[in-house]
A protein has these predicted regions:
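A cross-family phosphate/adenosyl-ligand binding-site feature
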Residues: 1-91, 98-186, 190-202
Length: 202
């Protein structure tokens, strides 16, 4: 979709996918600890700078452990530090086993996270890590992207507005043969149309 993506991993997530894989896909450095893992030239990974860099923050998968720490303000890894420092919209995609998903404490966690102003991406029904099948599977990546896109579009100031923009040269007849015109390229009209579309207009 053209977005510039930076990845922040938890220590546990590296047991499922390597930082190199995500770095290759995102074409950016992957952050997983407060300092770089190069022992010879370790550098501080400033969680505030990372948080302020993004226009939005997606936590996927959001495990029961991570979500409970988001609620309590626990800050024992880089991801949680970035979350607490983020001023941009935050989306989270829950992922856990069926019984964990249905547990009252999890429902309470959802409510508190949503009350904080975060956006919950609905979990899906499917095969779970336990081998069982049911609600709690993380939304598919394409569904996460679609959810975020729709949520952004719904908040745009020109949503559901229809705008007519003329572009290009104009001609005013003097008589059946002659006219007054101009050499307009239409670029201004195209620019206005693109700007209106980016604000949600049709």
């Amino acid at each position: 979709k053209g977005a510039n993506v930076k990845v922040v991993m938890t220590p546990a997530s590296k047991e499922f996918v390597t930082p190199l894989t995500l770095s290759t896909l995102s074409k950016n450095e992957v952050y997983s600890s407060f300092t770089s893992e190069d022992d010879d030239n370790a550098q501080w990974n400033n969680h505030v700078d990372i948080a302020q860099w993004g226009d939005l923050f997606i936590i996927a998968p959001a495990t029961a452990n991570t979500m409970s720490k988001m609620v309590s303000g626990t800050c024992d890894n880089l991801l949680l530090a970035v979350y607490l420092s983020a001023k941009c919209p935050v989306y989270y995609a829950p992922a856990m086993d069926l019984d964990m998903y249905k547990h009252p404490s999890t429902k309470d966690t959802f409510k508190k996270l949503n009350d904080f102003g975060n956006f919950q991406i609905p979990a899906e029904v499917g095969e779970l890590a336990s081998g069982l099948s049911g609600m709690g599977r993380m939304a598919e990546p394409q569904n996460i992207v679609s959810f975020v896109e729709k949520n952004i579009l719904d908040q745009l100031p020109l949503k559901n507005k229809c705008i007519l923009i003329t572009a290009g040269p104009t001609y005013e007849s003097i008589d059946p043969v002659r006219f007054i015109g101009n050499h307009s390229s239409g670029k201004m009209g195209y620019a206005l149309a693109e700007a209106a579309a980016s604000l949600g207009a049709q």
